[in-house]
Structures are given as structure tokens and as C-alpha cells.
A protein has these predicted regions:
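Conserved alpha-helical positions within TPR/SEL1-like repeat arrays
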Residues: 2-13, 36-43
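A short glycine-rich, Lys/Arg-flanked "PGG" loop and its adjoining helix->strand segment in the class I
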Residues: 211-226
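A conserved beta-strand element that flanks and buttresses the S-adenosyl-L-methionine
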Residues: 199-200
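Acceptor-substrate binding/catalytic loop of class I
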Residues: 237-252
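Class I SAM-dependent methyltransferase SAM/SAH-binding core
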Residues: 142-187
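Residue-level recognition of tetratricopeptide repeat
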Residues: 34, 68-69
Length: 291
């Protein structure tokens, strides 16, 4: 069964979707209660536009795996069969970053594939104008890929993340003063008027509505403090769940939210964040200043 799934994934990556479909169907014939086989078959059907069949597969995946580590409910939301959740479900996110943590540092070395950290670095350095060392929060710090960039500027450097696997990697580099395994909203609600700069690299892609998290970030910043962050760009709606199950937001949405909270946009740059299955993922990098 595993061999058929591996073959199906290889064929899918090669664009041989009909052959991949046959391979996943064979896996299901051999083991009908294998959630990953139904999920992968659903992705094939979704890709070729057989949405009703895709829905059946994702519903079956949920039936077999109620914890939904694979993200079947999010797939159903992209097909209009579920309400888009306010945030990336924790079970899915933990599984996602558990896999990512094993090769994240290698991915970030491949700047032809992943450029998110470089874009944040440029935004931070372009707008940093404080001669003294500052208090920095690396929000959703992951494995700590930005720590070596931020450390020379930091009086204190704090990292917060929800993934234990990512935080273990961040601990190994010994560049943070403190690391916390906490929900970001919970952590922010516990600190007020504390940070000179808050960094959120590929973090807001896990939040559908940004009103509350922006309010908490503003409250956690000192006056004239800066918020450096990236979003995946959405061009059709104000906010959306994209095809690879992350949230995207429009420039108008961010601008309106910043205006409402009296956060001044001092930097904005559109660029390619990364490549997902050979497709470019457009992003916007911002720096907002608390007035």
C-alpha cells in the first residue's frame, strides 16, 4: 500500500495525474481505511476539476481521521463545503511544521525556492534607524532562521512559536534570550508597551481575520515601535484561503486595518515569497510604525 502511495506522489509531481489517480485508487483497494490515500486522491480530483469526487474523498478522510492532521477540512473550505476557519487548525499546523522542521534550514539555503526570510531582512534593515540596541520579538520564530540577522541589533531577542519541533531547532542555535511555546495571541495579550520591533515572517498566513492580532501587536509595541511582517497577496478578495491551505490578504485590507489602528505604513514591497510546486507565491512585505 505504501508503495502505491509513494508512486502516486511521484507521478503527481511529474504531472502524470491519471496514472497517479490509478495508483491512489489501488492503495485504497488494498487498504480502504487509509486516510492518506483518500486525501491524496482528493487532491488529484481537485486538481483536474472533479470537485464533487474531491469532496467525497476529503469527507472520507475526515471520517477516517477525525483529528484532521492532513487538513481535509481546509480542503473542503477551499471547495466551498466548509466555513473558512478563523485560523489554521492547530492539529494540521503542528503536523505541517513537524515535517517542515526536519528540512527547514536546508530550504532556506535554497534562495531560488524560498526567499521569505531575505525579504523580511531587507525590510528590517531598510527601516531600522535606532543607534541603540532594541527589544525584539520574533513572532512565530520557527527554527530561528532570522535570529542571526536580528541578534546584532537586539538588547533582548525573544522567540515565540507553537511548534515544539521548530523550537527545539531554535534552542540549538543559542541566539535567543528567551523562547516560549505559546499561542501567539495569548503571549501578546500578556505583554504591553514592551517591544521596539515585532517580526512576523510568514506568520499571518495562519490567520484569516487580522483585526485582533493587529490590535494585540499594536498594544505590545512601544511608541514609535515597528511591526515587520509578510502576507501572501490576495488580488480577488480582501482575504481568502489559498490553494495550498494558507491565508492570503489584499493590500487594501492591510492598508484599511493599519489606518484604523493608527499604524503608519513606512515600508511596502511586493515580491516573490517562494515557489510552491514550481508556481511563484506573491507576497507583500510591510513595516508599520506605532504613532
Amino acid at each position: 500500500t505504501e508503495a502505491h502511495i509513494n508512486l502516486g506522489n511521484t507521478l503527481k509531481d511529474q504531472g502524470k495525474l491519471k496514472e497517479a489517480e490509478a495508483s491512489f485508487r489501488k492503495a485504497i483497494t488494498l487498504k480502504p481505511d487509509l486516510a492518506i490515500a483518500h486525501y491524496n486522491l482528493g487532491k488529484i480530483y481537485k486538481k483536474i476539476g472533479k470537485n464533487s469526487k474531491a469532496v467525497e474523498c476529503f469527507e472520507k478522510t475526515l471520517e477516517l481521521n477525525s483529528e484532521d492532521l492532513l487538513g481535509a477540512a481546509l480542503q473542503l473550505a477551499t471547495l466551498g463545503k466548509r466555513k473558512i476557519p478563523d485560523r489554521t487548525p492547530e492539529n494540521f499546523m503542528q503536523g505541517f511544521y513537524k515535517k517542515k522542521s526536519k528540512h527547514w534550514s536546508n530550504l532556506e539555503k535554497k534562495t531560488h525556492k524560498y526567499r521569505g526570510h531575505l525579504l523580511i531582512e531587507n525590510a528590517f534593515k531598510t527601516t531600522h534607524n535606532n543607534s541603540e540596541k532594541i527589544d525584539i520579538l520574533d513572532m512565530g520564530c520557527g527554527t530561528g532562521s532570522l535570529a542571526k540577522i536580528l541578534r546584532p541589533y537586539a538588547r533582548t531577542l525573544v522567540g515565540v512559536d507553537l511548534s515544539s519541533d521548530m523550537l527545539l531547532k531554535a534552542e540549538e542555535i543559542c541566539l535567543y534570550d528567551s523562547l516560549y511555546k505559546k499561542d501567539l495571541s495569548q503571549y501578546l495579550s500578556e505583554v504591553s508597551n514592551h517591544y521596539d520591533t515585532i517580526i512576523a515572517a510568514a506568520v499571518l498566513i495562519h490567520f484569516y481575520d487580522l483585526d485582533n492580532i493587529f490590535f494585540l501587536i499594536k498594544d505590545s509595541l512601544k511608541i514609535n515601535g515597528k511591526f515587520v511582517f509578510s502576507i501572501f497577496e490576495e488580488t480577488q478578495k480582501s482575504k481568502n484561503l489559498n490553494s495550498f491551505l494558507m491565508y492570503a490578504h489584499s493590500d487594501d485590507y492591510i492598508t484599511t486595518l493599519a489606518d484604523r489602528l493608527n499604524l503608519k505604513i513606512i515600508y511596502k514591497q511586493k515580491d516573490i515569497h517562494e515557489y510552491h510546486k514550481m508556481n511563484s507565491v506573491p507576497a507583500i512585505i510591510y513595516v508599520l510604525e506605532k504613532k
